Amino acid sequence: MKVESVTKEDTKKSERKIKIAIAKPEDYSNKNVILEKEEELICPVCGSKSIIKDYERAEIVCEMCGCVLQQNLFDVGPEWRAFDHEQRVKRSRVGAPMTYTIHDKGLSTVIDWRNKDSYGKDISADKRAQLYRLRKWQRRIRVSDASERNLAFALSELDRIASKLGLPRNVRENAAVLYRGAVEKGLIRGRSIEGVAAAALYAACRRCKVPRTLDEIAEVSRVDRKEIGRTYRFISRELNIRLAPTNPVDYVPRFASELKLPGEVESKAISILQKAGERGLTSGRGPTGVAAAAIYIASVLQGTRRTQREVADVAGVTEVTIRNRYKELTEHLDIDVTL
């Protein structure tokens, strides 16, 4: 068997030139910044960012030009398969993943509250007293100083608001990252923890295209709408958060679901809003009012009409707003609606 020697020069020539952009902790304008160091692969041939990880062929490939960026890719996932959450929990041999929604990122340990041994048997009274003391000191150790206590309180408040609003996990992670960024830059001083947490959650909702209005967040938080809006503008400026105006289309699925409207109405409303956007009818107008008017028009056209009062209650706007937006959309888009 012939073995060829490989020099350092040959190794350098064979290396793939992959541009890696690592997100800096102070750059919070990118909506995909979830981890402290997140890698982004860019094709060295065409410059595309559309990169596919093909684990079957063990390759990283550019979707646009087909250039193979890396070979012999290792799959770092588990070797077992699970088809539901119960199987996944049963077969997993590691703890929970790291998360930014816990003040210590979920890396510390917790002593179980059940007074049982590894065989499931009850432990003695002496052991129970010892475990009680250990649990007490464990709680104290996890939160060592005032800054950690404040962070733990803020993240619990953030999680409480998110639970009330039914927000998904990625929104909570984004909000936690934004709040930690505000703490690192000293933006909390002189402001309430609840206000900054609510503002971070509002920014995360807009970033993840899961829109919630300031009124909705203020209703479940301990601060008013005015303070949340003022704090949101402040942290957006200081953290360099650039967010596009909220698209009315993003509100349609939620409003249609709450009104129990069929999918045809939702699709029709989205079509109306897309045409309105092309003609500039959504600029300078509240996205919730425009979305509510489009849903009202679509429900009438599809024969599943909802009253203006019903739509207004769900969207959090007045009936006058719906009528004004309704007139604009029907006149400029030549929609014939028979009431």
Curated annotation (Swiss-Prot):
GO annotation, cellular component aspect: transcription preinitiation complex
Keywords: Metal-binding, Repeat, Transcription, Transcription regulation, Zinc, Zinc-finger
Residues that bind Zn(2+): 43, 46, 62, 65
Zn finger (TFIIB-type) location: 39-70
Keyword Transcription: yes
Example GO biological process: transcription preinitiation complex assembly
InterPro entries given in the database record: Cyclin-like_dom, Cyclin-like_sf, TFIIB, TFIIB_arc, TFIIB_CS, TFIIB_cyclin, Znf_TFIIB
Protein origin, superkingdom: Archaea
PROSITE patterns referenced in this protein's UniProt entry, alphabetically: TFIIB (PS00782), ZF_TFIIB (PS51134)
Positions annotated as Sequence repeat: 156-239, 250-331
GO molecular-function terms, A-Z: DNA-binding transcription factor activity; TBP-class protein binding; zinc ion binding
CDD domains for the chain: CYCLIN_TFIIB_archaea_like_rpt1, CYCLIN_TFIIB_archaea_like_rpt2
Pfam families according to UniProt: TFIIB, Zn_Ribbon_TF
Protein family: Belongs to the TFIIB family.
Function statement: Stabilizes TBP binding to an archaeal box-A promoter. Also responsible for recruiting RNA polymerase II to the pre-initiation complex (DNA-TBP-TFIIB).
Protein name as it appears in the record: Transcription initiation factor IIB
Organism: Methanococcus maripaludis (strain DSM 14266 / JCM 13030 / NBRC 101832 / S2 / LL)
